UniProtKB/Swiss-Prot annotation:
The lineage of its organism: Bacteria, Bacillati, Bacillota, Bacilli, Bacillales. Residues 1-12 have a biased composition (Basic and acidic residues). GO terms for biological process: sporulation resulting in formation of a cellular spore; symbiont-mediated killing of host cell. Residues 14-33 have a biased composition (Polar residues). This is Pesticidal crystal protein Cry3Bb. It comes from Bacillus thuringiensis. The gene is cry3Bb. Changing F352S: In strain: EG5144. The keyword Acetylation does not apply. The keyword Membrane does not apply. Changing Q21P: In strain: EG5144. Promotes colloidosmotic lysis by binding to the midgut epithelial cells of Coleoptera. Has moderate level of toxicity to southern corn rootworm.
């Protein structure tokens, strides 16, 4: 099934607001053939100035590519870790149906997606060769999965030497074919255009290599052969990750510009490559079953931005500049949750008072830090203050999984056109009560020329097999707006995070729990949050100055988790050797020895990160527990970057 298809009842059809009672003519210039608006009457103007940039959003091929990327990440997040082995064949069948469905070609969609984003084409010879290689990979991989399914269904006592030789042969053929085909997805001059294709093929290859660790000796491979496959997997994990991050940055930097329109294209590339490439490579380390010998509970804390809510191509030149938008986006910060939005509204007059409308002119945002702090954070004010009554929506911890925003325009005979957002529906889901509801910002006045922007068009659900409130892929966590030049209106846009984020920092009783360090509720003065390198799924904690206590967390445990004890492991990069410590509410005090992994001038790459583990373990009491990370004997001006803390159950 195409993961981006939606049933008819999920599609919002926008029509002029029939509930709004107006007595004035909606199109004053259309009645007078001698009145001109840049030599067009009003109706013609509205018809011809529809935003051409929406063509990208309406491209079904691009939507299919994004939907497939989201679906693949969602499927893998649900099974990472060794329990993978128990449900492996059913996972592979679902995975195959996603990346090689019978009714579509996601690989062509991945290629077309980037062609649209950067306005370049892959040469036909390179595309044809890549597609031919992919067809061969599909055949090899399907043959292997079918053989694996038969192998697993056959009782141990009935497995023959012939069947053992056969599955080993099919595995080896598929693995070598992937290894030999990968250069076809990294052809010189087309590396950026092939990026999602490369990432998806690399992911499939690493999934396959993992099976040598799960089944290798069972299939008759020697321990030396299994070790060789393992070292190949580690080497390729680094190689594939670095390739994706490097060419993502090349592509992104190539789209930097100076105008509003340049920023929209830049942000689309950033968003769609995050969904189809960067989110995927975050998962590569989990295929190392020697490190992740249990299931894994993890989360993606990165932010992505949907398109600004802007409907008229004619007004592109009045948008804010590239730098003004990029510089006003929130800097890296501790993770927080959307609590509420205070909407300010102003009147936009139309021609001689006609076709006037109220619009979203500015806003405050209220957020809550990660569990552990009860304070509310109020954002700076964005936009223009109200001339109309202020509206405040409180989301109170519920997850907003969809927004539908309506826009309106007012046109004047002198050629000036004004834009505004008149209404936004926020669909929210309370997963504690399993209830859905909708809250609405409504400016209370529009002139009937309405277009709509639906967040689902840019952030499709993980699957269409469940209702949207269960299958959504992202949740809203921030809103900003920018003033247009020449006071032509206000442009709002939304920030989203992945649905995998756990509001409560819950430690699992049976899985390895990854807690991103940005989920802390407090930092020391010597620590800060910096932008992540692209393969961590979020931002990093950076320590540059001496500090005993670095970060404070609160974690949640159920009764089963309270019976466990946990080893603690930290993923980090460092320019020095030092000792970290982890302390909990029970006063368990664990020391972690950190080794130097990089020099001060080195860039952060996959290879600069390492894992360090405590020698002893800790337990918890009570369902809420404090946790502190600190540093001993840290020398100022050295650098340490912390990505995640992992809690590994040791007593099942």
């Amino acid at each position: 099934m195409n993961p981006n298809n939606r049933s008819e009842h999920d599609t919002i059809k926008v029509t002029p607001n029939s509930e709004l009672q107006t007595n004035h003519n909606q199109y004053p210039l259309a009645d007078n053939p001698n009145s001109t608006l840049e030599e067009l009457n009003y109706k013609e103007f509205l018809r011809m100035t529809e935003d051409s940039s929406t063509e990208v959003l309406d491209n079904s091929t691009v939507k299919d590519a994004v939907g497939t990327g989201i679906s693949v990440v969602g499927q893998i997040l649900g099974v990472v870790g060794v329990p993978f082995a128990g449900a492996l064949t059913s996972f592979y069948q679902s995975f195959l149906n996603t990346i090689w469905p019978s009714d579509a070609d996601p690989w062509k969609a991945f290629m077309a997606q980037v062609e649209v984003l950067i306005d370049k084409k892959i040469e036909e010879y390179a595309k044809s060769k890549a597609l031919a290689e992919l067809q061969g990979l599909q055949n090899n991989f399907e043959d292997y999965v079918n053989a694996l399914n038969s192998w697993k269904k056959t009782p141990l006592s009935l497995r023959s030497k012939r069947s053992q030789d056969r599955i080993r042969e099919l595995f080896s053929q598929a693995e070598s074919h992937f290894r030999n085909s990968m250069p076809s997805f990294a052809v010189s001059k087309f590396e950026v255009l092939f990026l999602p294709t490369y990432a998806q093929a690399a992911n499939t290859h690493l999934l396959l290599l993992k099976d040598a660790q799960v089944f290798g000796e069972e299939w008759g491979y020697s321990s030396e052969d299994v070790a060789e496959f393992y070292h190949r997997q580690l080497k390729l994990t680094q190689q594939y990750t670095d390739h994706c991050v490097n060419w993502y940055n090349v592509g992104l930097n190539g789209l930097r510009g100076s105008t509003y329109d340049a920023w929209v294209k830049f942000n689309r590339f950033r968003r769609e490559m995050t969904l189809t490439v960067l989110d995927l490579i975050v998962l590569f380390p989990f295929y190392d079953i020697r490190l992740y010998s249990k299931g894994v509970k993890t989360e993606l804390t990165r932010d992505i931005f949907t398109d600004p809510i802007f409907s008229l191509n004619t007004l592109q030149e009045y948008g804010p500049t590239f730098l003004s938008i990029e510089n006003s986006i929130r800097k890296p910060h501790l993770f927080d949750y959307l609590q509420g939005i205070e909407f300010h509204t102003r009147l936009q007059p139309g021609y001689f008072g006609k076709d006037s409308f109220n619009y979203w002119s500015g806003n405050y945002v209220e957020t809550r830090p990660s569990i552990g702090s009860s304070k509310t954070i109020t954002s700076p004010f964005y936009g223009d203050k109200s001339t109309e009554p202020v509206q405040k929506l409180s989301f109170d911890g519920q997850k907003v999984y969809r927004t539908i925003a309506n826009t309106d325009v007012a046109a004047w005979p002198n050629g000036k056109v004004y834009l505004g957002v008149t209404k936004v529906d926020f669909s929210q889901y309370d997963d504690q009560k399993n209830e859905t509801s909708t809250q609405t910002y409504d400016s209370k006045r529009n002139n009937g020329h309405v277009s709509a922007q639906d967040s689902i068009d840019q952030l499709p659900p993980e699957t269409t097999d469940e209702p949207l409130e269960k299958a959504y892929s992202h949740q809203l966590n921030y809103a900003e707006c920018f003033l247009m030049q020449d006071r032509r209106g206000t442009i709002p846009f939304f920030t989203w995070t992945h649905r995998s984020v756990d509001f409560f920092n819950t430690i699992d009783a049976e899985k390895i729990t990854q807690l991103p360090v940005v989920k802390a509720y407090a930092l020391s003065s010597g620590a800060s949050i910096i932008e992540g390198p692209g393969f961590t799924g979020g931002n990093l904690l950076f320590l540059k100055e001496s500090s005993n206590s670095i970060a404070k967390f609160k974690v949640t445990l159920n009764s089963a988790a309270l019976l466990q004890r946990y080893r603690v492991r930290i993923r980090y990069a460092s320019t020095t050797n030092l000792r970290l410590f982890v302390q909990n509410s029970n006063n368990d005090f664990l020391v972690i020895y950190i080794n130097k992994t990089m020099n001060k001038d080195d860039d952060l790459t996959y290879q600069t990160f390492d894992l360090a583990t405590t020698n002893s373990n800790m337990g918890f009491s009570g369902d809420k527990n404090e946790l502190i990370i600190g540093a001993e004997s840290f020398v100022s001006n050295e650098k340490i970057y912390i990505d995640k803390i992992e809690f590994i159950p040791v007593q099942l």
